[in-house]
């Protein structure tokens, strides 16, 4: 859903906000869609464990407006991380969001 890195190489600062002070290691950060879903290659990030939350900084408003429901994937929630607090600013999509504008027709 963050298409900018794949489309034109936009570089977003990625931080492990679950474990920000651990030793830094090199990671490739990828998504769950098979085609060109790579956010960063060989990026230095604090040690990552399953369940950690990664923050993509300086993403801006275009990230949502450029997102899609490719492969019927729900758009994730948007979360603002400010003053050590997580605030949901857009809810995660659900199945009903994918079909709400579809119209049933009888052929």
Predicted segment positions?
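Charged (often Lys/Glu-rich) extended helix/loop segments that serve as interaction or gating elements
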Residues: 1-107
């Amino acid at each position: 859903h963050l298409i900018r890195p794949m489309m034109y190489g936009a570089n977003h600062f990625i931080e492990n906000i679950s474990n920000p002070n651990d030793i830094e290691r090199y990671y490739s950060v990828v998504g769950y869609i098979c085609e060109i879903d790579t956010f960063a290659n060989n990026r230095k990030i604090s040690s990552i464990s399953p369940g950690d939350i990664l923050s993509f900084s300086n993403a801006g408003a275009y990230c949502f407006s450029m997102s899609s429901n490719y492969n019927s994937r729900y758009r994730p929630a948007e979360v603002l991380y400010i003053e050590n607090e997580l605030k949901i600013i857009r809810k995660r999509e659900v199945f009903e969001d994918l079909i709400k504008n579809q119209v049933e027709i009888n052929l």
